[in-house]
């Protein structure tokens, strides 16, 4: 476990693989008991506890009727799961380069020849010997194997390197040789909810990459490696499952949060034709003000209103939120354009806004025409589409569905999927109706995790951002959010963007 690492977290996880292949869930336990029994019998007969894999499988054959062919399978899996520890290998190469003698030691039941094959397969070719506990009936755990090594090289300074503090360092020093501790690559804190074989493989990948001593990336890159890879892989498989269930002929990945997800999907998981679509809640809701006027008020106007009560006039408010074309109508409705938001009546402003939906619709005509051409071109002849987003309320999915049915064709079947959803009643109903299918969590799926991501009670913006942003910025693009659709002079659809280019571009890139 120092020179070589495994593709699983613990050595006994190899037994779990065998249990699956044998269709015998209790094999892992039986294999451990057989080894313990073999060691006890060896100690009674010969005064030591070092056993070979043949002796372990002799017990398995006698007690559980396990054929010896499974011993060869275990050896084969050990070979297949072993990989080079790049940090130790770099040290090994340097030692060989300066003419040092390298000897490997291990407390192990595998044959010496097998261990030699495993080392050589990982690039270790120029070592002098392997001291294996089952060959000498001695072990590092009590220092006796180290003493045997000292007998071989009595006039040499020996430095022992290992990841077991007690055996590799304390016992080595007690036996008379110098020792260096190389900390175990395995995490001290494990995710117990991944306490299975898939979790073992995942943790091995993370541990063997992050914890050998060669990892030099920052916090954000590390977060992406630990979380982003496995999450994206699982989500892409989920997308294909939902697409198959819904018989989707086209997948639409929503900007900006699905920028990376679409790239990964097309590189490794592509089964359905797909496009990355330019969209935002603001842009798509303003295509259909007759449906989303109240949402527009709550999400974009009143939120800004509350943040700038004593700093913005109504005219400035409408200008900053993109509705400056409504300013001339204010005074006709007893609203002073120069009055600060704190002095204005929200109820009166809401009545004003909702009574001018026809003005909003007229203003959005050119945008609707451009958006109709844009989405119609992407959808083509598809009769069923799946819209993919990251989270949380599914607004882009539902608003785009409404626009498609209203402006393109009511016969197109639209469904959606999210990594995580909110826990609102509306979202729960959409999930129960199988219109939106969440991946990781939602009101009807992994509800404990959903409650963590969407905590009840009043929370600050920062608290919510700390829950949601680490998920979103792993996948998002670096571009500013979309404001509007329009057509160029040559009738090509183009986009108006906000000036809010992300401030954390370096973190996003990491």
Located regions from the model:
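Substrate-recognition "cap/lid" segment bordering the active-site pocket of phosphatases
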Residues: 103-105, 109-157
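Acidic, divalent-metal-coordinating active-site segment for phosphoryl/phosphodiester hydrolysis
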Residues: 164-179
